[in-house]
Amino acid sequence: MSGKSRVHIDPNCRVSYGAFYIRGLYDVFGKQRVGFSTRFFSGLKHEAPKPDYEHYMALVVAGPGSSRKRVVIDFHDSTKINEAAYDWCDVYAKTNYNKDSHPPGLYPKVVVTAPNSGYRIWGLNETRFHLYTNLLRCKLEPLSGRHRFRKDYMYQHDRRPIETYESCAQQQERSLDASPYVFFISTLWPHQNCIDVTNPYRKRFMDICRSLPIEFEGGFFGDDPTHPQYEAFRDLIIHRKYGLDGYIAKMTRSAFAFNTPAVHGCHGWKLSEYLAMGKAILSTPIMNELPAPLEHGRHVHFAQTDEGMREGVAMLLHDPAYRAHLQEGARDYYRHHASPEAAIRVILESDPFLK
């Protein structure tokens, strides 16, 4: 019913997080049928006035007559369900859902959708237009606060369109020279799960790459000497800042990408970017659900132990046929399950009214 419907988005939406899904709505419904409105959201109760909209985007799909469906897209890093938003909606799309974190059958409205990243969807004039009109719709008091609200819109514009990432799939080298190149950068996160799991995984990967006769570039951004891992990771701390265009160019050149769950075990923005770029991906095990499983040896190469990681690095460096196979698998997964359009279609297909 997408051709007959209009989509109304709550203007309190954090567009820096929601832009990926807004782009998907444009792709499915048509841009002229997607807009912002406060008309349908008076019944949406907020558990915490300001943090709420770091977590989700509320929207209403309005069909012919008075028919409508209320949808929440929860893109928070944690697996927690926002109870107030869940009670309000008909469909609760969750980016980071872990079925082991909730009793079976407790949340029947949940549908798992694709991981997102930060992408530009509007030019500067359109960004300013939506910023000021939505600020007025929020009566100058958006839930995230005016300063953050404005920063979100400009951050969205400072990103790159998803087509920039998609075009990298055609630019990648299918073969490597005698001294291959691997690029990986990360923040040295202070969250406990990152201290326990994410940061050590990333350090082991970097150490493996640095031990090989290849050109490795990257490290951890970490300017806080009080971080509990700062001393242990000191030789991997970098202070150079990479511009977004430089980052994309280096990731395109890199023989493959490395992925591991991030803050609170979330998918992280890197996964969305790598799939859009059609990268061959070496990944530690995925913690949360996906709209369809990433298959080892088809879409991604999984490794967990040091030995497995070392073997995976060697395969991706020295087996061009396998690397090309994973690149094609990543592109195929992206097209069917992880593009903005695919992320919205899996939501629509979960409810007969929305199909």
Enumerate the predicted regions with their spans:
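Nucleotide-sugar donor-binding catalytic core of glycosyltransferases
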Residues: 2-268, 286-292
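Generic surface-pattern signal
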Residues: 30, 118, 145, 210, ...
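Catalytic binding pocket for nucleotide-activated donors in carbohydrate/polymer assembly enzymes
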Residues: 233-238, 244-354
